[in-house]
């Protein structure tokens, strides 16, 4: 497999474990962020739905998966864009809303709602020169083609421009742990050289963002199929609007979170039998090397 087609420069899941007290404190801060996110969505009638471990946690545990350390929610692009415009105006005193529009040093194609005054430094993003606080992820879903060949073309184009965007900002991004030896050295040098060349030829972050959005938001057919182009296996987590909305609320800790109507069709292609607990060596998290909870206490 060519290195450009692998999930470089993304978060690589860890098997490290937190101190139990710190993990629970982290989850409770994230839960606070989620509640504020939901309140704003409900106020402005913006649909959203949980994905990944957050959705599985609601179904299997009625809250966080015991070892999980993040929250993931999704919105259709039009609702995502509206949220990212409204949110800084209404909650900017408490949160930073990071996207490629609001934070020019931010290298990712999805949003983060970050609690001000906190720090959450993942190994994968230590090189990032942007606010690294406790957050929830917000993924935009874009309309995509019913034609598999055309859809895969758009996936390749968006993935390519997303990787280039990272290299306009970070010369030494984290590489997957299974890349070792001469391949790792070659990839490291390749990243540094490309970073320099981009500066010389004025290939900017905004240019890469525009190219990404051109491919992500342009769908030739009148489809009700939607995909998260920022996720490498996004095709496994596609939704159809007719099978997804209106969403249904499920218990999550002391609140409720929205899931797509046909959550099984949504989750099973990516996660298989998600109601079964995975073996211990497959219980991954994002693991932060440093956490500041914003109240003077730190941990990891």
Segment roles from a protein language model:
Residues 2-6:
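Conserved oxyanion/phosphate-binding beta-strand-loop segments in alpha/beta enzyme cores
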Residues 10, 14-42, 87-146, 166-300:
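Conserved catalytic core of two-metal-ion nucleotidyltransferases
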Residues 38-71, 75-81, 242, 261, ...:
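Active-site nucleotide-donor binding segment shared across nucleotidyl transfer reactions
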Residues 83-85:
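Conserved SAM-binding loop
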Residues 148-153:
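A short secondary-structure junction signal
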Residues 155-159:
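Short, His- and charge-rich active-site/binding loops that engage polyanionic ligands
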Residues 161-163:
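Mobile amphipathic helical/loop "lid" adjacent to a hydrophobic cofactor/ligand pocket
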């Amino acid at each position: 497999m060519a290195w450009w087609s692998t999930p470089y420069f993304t978060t690589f899941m860890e098997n490290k474990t937190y101190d139990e007290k710190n993990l629970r404190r982290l989850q409770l801060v994230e839960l606070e962020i989620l509640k504020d996110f939901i309140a704003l969505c409900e106020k402005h009638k913006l649909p959203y739905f949980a994905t990944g471990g957050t959705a599985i946690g609601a179904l299997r545990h009625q809250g966080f998966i015991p070892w999980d350390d993040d929250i993931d929610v999704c919105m259709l692009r039009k609702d995502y864009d509206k949220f990212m415009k409204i949110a800084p105006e209404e909650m900017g005193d408490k949160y930073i809303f990071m996207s490629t529009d609001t934070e020019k040093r931010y290298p990712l194609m999805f949003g983060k709602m970050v609690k001000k005054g906190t720090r959450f430094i993942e190994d994968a993003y230590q090189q990032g020169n942007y606010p690294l606080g406790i957050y929830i992820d917000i993924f935009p879903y874009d309309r995509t083609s019913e034609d598999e060949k055309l859809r895969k073309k758009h996936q390749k184009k968006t993935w390519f421009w997303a990787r280039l965007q990272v290299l306009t900002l970070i010369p030494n991004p984290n590489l997957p742990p299974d890349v070792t030896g001469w391949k790792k050295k070659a990839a490291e040098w390749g990243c540094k050289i490309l970073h320099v060349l981009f500066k010389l030829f004025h290939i900017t972050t905004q240019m890469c963002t525009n190219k990404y959005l051109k491919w992500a938001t342009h769908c030739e057919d009148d489809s009700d199929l939607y995909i998260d182009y920022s996720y490498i296996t996004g095709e496994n987590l596609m939704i159809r609007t007719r099978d997804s909305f209106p969403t249904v609320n499920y218990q999550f800790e002391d609140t409720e979170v929205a899931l797509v109507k046909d959550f099984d069709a949504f989750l099973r292609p990516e996660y298989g039998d998600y109601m079964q607990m995975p073996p211990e060596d497959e219980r991954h998290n994002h693991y932060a090397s440093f956490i500041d909870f914003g109240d003077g206490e730190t941990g990891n």
